[in-house]
Structures are given as C-alpha cells and as structure tokens.
Amino acid sequence: MQCEQSKLTRILYQQLREKPDFELQFDAQVKDVTQHRSGVEIAIERNGRTETRTGRWLIGADGARSDVRRALGIEFPGFTWPERFLVVSTPFDFRAVIPDLVAVSYVSDPERWHFLLQIPSLCRVMFPIAPHESDELAVSADFAQSLMATVVPGVSNYEVAHVTLYKVHQRVAKTFQRGRAFLAGDAAHINNPLGGMGMNGGIHDAINLTSRLVEVWHGTKAEAELERYDRQRRLVTLEYIEKQSIQNKRNLESNGTDFGRSLAEIAADKSRTYEYLLRVSMIASLRRAQALG
C-alpha cells in the first residue's frame, strides 16, 4: 500500500480536529524549552506575539530542522550526500509501455540510476543530480526532459506536472530524550528516501513513545518506562533504517549484475527470502526494538 505523506497528514488532521481535548495551532514557532521537575514549558511565537504552553511532557516531531531539538541542545550528527535528488512528476502511464511494471520500481545504473513511484494520477521519477550539475540546470525543462528520455527508449517530450530538487541527508540525533522532552520522526532521524523508511520509521517512533506515555499517564507504569523509548528507537534507527537506506542507494549505484545475482540467490532460498522481507519491510527492526527491553 502506498500512502503519500500529504494525504496521511490530511487524514490525521481531520481526525484530530474532532477531538475535544486536542488543539491544533498553525504558524507557531517554538522559541524556547524550559524543563521543571514535573513538567515542560515552551515559548512559542505566534501572530507576532510570544505565548507559553505547559505540559507534563513534550514531543518534538517538528521535522528535520526541529526547533525543539535545537532548543534542547541535542546534536544531530551525520552527513549530507554530495548528490541531490530530482523528482519529476508526470501523468504519463509507464505501465502502458513497460510490461509488468509495479507500483515502485528501482533501476540500477552506475551512471545515473532512477526509480519510478506510481501514485494516483501521476508517476514520480527520481534521479540523482551530480555535484557539478547546478540547481538551475537540474530544474530546467530541457534537463528534466533529457533525463526522462532515458527511462523508456523512444519516448520523449513528457508532460511534466512539476519538478522538485532537494538535498539528501543521513543524520541521527545524539539522543531521542532529554528529561521530559522527546524527539520523533524527522526531528530525530533523517535518511535518503530509497526504501520508504523515513515516514514509516517516524510512525514507529510515535507508536512506541505514545503507548508508553499512556501507561505512565494512567499510572500503570513508572516514568522510568519512558527511557526505553530512546534505548529502543535510536538503536534500531542506526542498525536498520540508516544502514538499509544507505545500502539501498549503493545497490542502485551498482551495475545491477551483482545485485541481481544476490537477489536471485536470496529468492532461491526460502529462509533467506523470509529474512530479507522482514528486514526491508522493517518488521525485523520492530522485533529488534522489542528484544532490547
């Protein structure tokens, strides 16, 4: 199942706005975080004014440039890939010209790999952009067409809905918890999108943390239970999400022959196939987190 983040957020928004004890505020920026023995206070800037909010805990799920993470003084080590990624969205129906094309298709090429993601009404095609290729060149119409012409021989002059160019990072916060404040999602970890592990990993963070908060809130578990969140989620992020997403990129940069042979060997062995599917589906990472206690 493919569900774009833009669609998921709208679904969540509709659900949350109907909750009587839930308040959604937009255009509000966290400026400071102060922790007390029994709670957290944040200063937010909204409509030109500074306001304060208090609570027992704080979850910073405010993206890769997290103001909460910065206010807490938590480092965000890692690296930025030298390549940028270009996404070209087109209504062209690749399934009509590529037999047996699936919803997500990866094409390895040491010169310039690409992958196709089919969503309702559009197909998104991603390419790496080399360091020597400027941003201006990358988003130009002619350059996008030249890349798209390599996808299917003989097909050119695609209708392009839009192009998006962005930098790609691999970073994991030094800790996912500081006192009564927690980090989740992109605020805690970011990775290249190959394999679809970013948003899924963030959802795993949310379920892991909030289930513990509910238990502590209702008094069925002590507050020490919350420390397991950082212990579990940060380690599996390093061991699985970061490691696998980096390997996915390296696989695409290969000539495809060795990787194809490796996949064929895995497919021929039921036990290895099972282990491989557990890993790439992220089920293995959930089991690993549970085993950490």
Model-derived segments and their meaning:
Residues 1-293:
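Core Rossmann-like FAD-binding/catalytic domain of the broad FAD-dependent monooxygenase superfamily
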